[in-house]
Amino acid sequence: MKAIQLYYPPEWAHCYGCGYLNAHGLHIQTYWDPEKGESETRFTPRPYHTAIPGFVYGGLLASLVDCHSTATAAAAKAQAERLSLEATP
């Protein structure tokens, strides 16, 4: 299964959170399960993603929510309209 973000065209692939062309980004990847109509993203914060010891920086959480929800919406819309994720947007 290929991550939804990997279907994004190059001009959309620079996002700090999920852009595969952003060398310094987080490279968040979301996976769609068409049978369940659900998506999943897994991400393990690194020690340098902390706000204070033991707590993840809020900006990282916002990036996770943003990138995961955008990819999920794209996959859900594609499925609802019977489109392939591989089709050009």
Task: Write out the residue ranges for each language-model feature.
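Terminal targeting signals and extreme-terminal segments of soluble enzymes
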Residues: 1-89
